[in-house]
Amino acid sequence: MRVLVTGGAGYVGCVLVQGLLARGCEVRVLDSLRKPGAPLVPLLANPKLEFQRGDVRDRRAVEEALRGADVVVHLAAVVGYPACERDPWLAREVNVGGTLNLTAARSPGQLIVFPSSLSNYGSVKDGLCTEEMEPQPLTLYGATKLEAERLVLEEGNAVVLRPATAFGLSPQLRLDLLFNNFMFLALNEGAIVVYQPHFWRAFIHVRDFARAILFAIDNAERMRDQVYNLGAEALNLTKGELAARIAERLGCRLQISEDGEDPDKRNYRVDFSKLEALGFRTQETINDGIEEMARGLQVISLPNPYSNASYY
C-alpha cells in the first residue's frame, strides 16, 4: 500500500509515519517544513519513505505528491485557536485552500482519511456531543476544519475523524496543547494556573491518534463517507480535573484563577461510541501520559515552549 501523508513531519504525522513504515507501507510525506524536519531524519534510512518538501497550497506540489498513492492522510493544517487567530489568512489558505487542492487533484479511487477536530462542536452545556449534532464552531480553527470536512465528504471516498485534544510525547513535540502545557508548567515553573476549571475537554494520546488513522485505513469499507468522534469516555475531563491529577502526581502548586478567562471557549463532553462500536479502543491513559511526559521533558530544552506550536 502506498500512503501519502500531508503534514507528515508534524506532531501526529511523524508518529503516524513510524506506524505506517512498521507495517511495510510505502510512505510519501508532503510537508512545507514550517517546523524542523529533524524528527523524520532517522526514518529516511528506510527506502520505503520518500520526502517531498512542498505546501498543500501549491496545486502542482499536491498533484505530484498524489501520484501513485492509494491512501491520503491529510494532516497538514494550521492547528489550534492561537495559531489561527495569529494569522487568519494563512489559516484559511492552508486549512481550506489546501484541502480544496487535495480534493480537486486526487482521483476518485484514492481514499482520504481526514483528521478534523472536536473544536467543530464549540460549547455544549448539556449532554454529550455526537456526530449527529449540528456543529457550532466558536473559533476560526473550528470553522476552517468544519469547512474542510465538508469539502472532503462532498467528494466521497473519505473517512473523517474528529479527534480529541492530543497529548503525549512525539519526536515533533508540541507544548501548546493543554495537557502538554500543564506538564511543562508543572515541571518548569512548579505551578499550574487554571482558568475556567469547570470547562470540559476531551483528550487522546498521540499514539492512539495515529492508531485510529491506521484503523480507519483498515476499515475504510465500513467507515467510508462518515464522521467519527475520536477519543474515550474516560478521557473526558474538566480542565480542573486534569490539572489536579498532574499536580497530585508531580507535587506542584495548583492555582485556580477567578480573575482571567481562557480565550478558547470550547466546553464539551463527547460521545465516542460510534467508533468504539466498530472495535476501536484507545490504549493510553492520562496517567500514562503524565509518567511519560515527566520522563521526556527532563531532556527537552526549548527557549520558547511555544516555538513549535501551530502545525500538525
Give the positions of each predicted feature.
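Conserved beta-loop-beta element that borders a ligand/cofactor-binding pocket
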Residues: 116-117, 149-170
